[in-house]
Curated annotation (Swiss-Prot):
It is a peripheral membrane protein. May be involved in tuning the metabolism, energy expenditure, and excretion processes. It holds the Pfam family DUF4619. InterPro entries: FAME. This is Factor associated with metabolism and energy. Residues 173-204, 256-281 are annotated as: Disordered. One of its GO terms (biological process) is energy homeostasis. It comes from the Eukaryota. Its main location: membrane. Residues 173-187, 267-281 have a biased composition (Basic and acidic residues). The lineage of its organism: Eukaryota, Metazoa, Chordata, Craniata, Vertebrata.
């Protein structure tokens, strides 16, 4: 970076003529050099000069600027030098100097290692490695023996568990077979009893009794015997059908016991009102499976 530098100079072209010829424009070749140290005189002079220029340029168009790209303009122009009042350095590098290189030193300096010390360190390292290898060799058989014992223990526990499961399955199968064997004779006995009992299609059995049976006179002992016999038969529902068939057969043949009775009893029965025939209904009770075996 150098102090000398080139600046582009601007050319001012006047466009409109002056309206008042008497007013003289300020000389273009006049150059102000502000070398006075007194700041007040400099500012007052610049303000008075600017006022004179404004009065002279009233009614004119603003000037056009043209770049000549490094060529000097023919007309002279005002120049102003920025001269600092204080005496100081103008160089940017001197104003902002770069940082100085700092020397970094380690805190712990390495010790000087001799050849004898290096050999002793190597020997100690090899001895330590050999000791570690020997310890590993001593630990490996102990570790394998522990593993072997653990595996053997797990195998024994697995065998015991399988044996217990097999015993439980065997017990379950034996219990099932015993139940089947107990139920088979019961089923056989039940089938025999069902086959031995007569089968009636209708569950409700109607017992039609003749009118003469209902005449419970004091002298009619035969009727009481028949009623007793009928009450006994009520406990055996499968015998009611046979009794009815026998009564119907006897009626058809006319050989009933009460037909051979005296004529006096017949006349008394005719005089009295004949009661309505009694119809008894009884549902057939089928014995259950458990009750059949409980009776034994």
């Amino acid at each position: 970076m150098g102090l000398s530098h080139s600046k582009t100079h601007l050319r001012v072209i006047k466009v409109a003529p002056l309206q008042n010829k008497e007013v003289e424009t300020p000389s273009a070749g006049r150059v102000d050099f502000a070398f006075n140290q007194n700041l007040e005189e400099k500012t007052s002079y610049s303000l008075a000069r600017l006022q004179d220029q404004n009065k002279a340029l009233e009614g004119q168009l603003p000037p056009l600027q043209e770049n000549w790209y490094g060529r000097y303009s023919t007309a002279s122009r005002d120049m102003y030098f920025d001269i600092p009042l204080e005496h100081r350095e103008t160089s940017i590098i001197k104003r902002h100097p770069p940082q100085r290189l700092q020397k970094l030193e380690p805190i712990d300096l390495p010790r000087v290692i001799t050849s004898g010390r290096l050999l002793s360190q190597r020997e100690a390292r090899t001895m330590h490695k050999a000791k570690q290898v020997l310890e590993k060799k001593m630990q490996t058989p102990m570790y394998t023996s522990e593993n072997r014992q653990y595996l053997h223990k797990m195998q024994v526990l697995e065998m015991i568990r399988k044996r217990q499961e097999a015993q439980m399955e065997l017990k379950k199968s034996l219990h099932g077979e015993a139940r089947i064997n107990k139920q088979s004779p019961r089923d056989h006995k039940a089938k025999k009893t069902l086959q031995s009992t007569p089968r009636n299609d209708d569950h409700d059995l109607l017992t039609m009794l003749p009118d003469e049976i209902l005449n419970r006179g004091p002298g009619n002992s035969k009727n009481t015997e028949f009623l007793k016999h009928q009450a006994v038969n009520n406990y055996c529902p499968w015998k009611i059908g046979k009794m009815e068939t026998w009564l119907h057969e006897q009626e058809a043949q006319g050989q009933l016991l009460w037909d051979s009775s005296s004529s006096d009893s017949d006349e008394q029965g005719k005089d009295e009102k004949k009661p309505r025939a009694l119809v008894r209904t009884r549902t057939e009770r089928i014995p259950l499976f458990d009750e059949f075996f409980d009776q034994e």
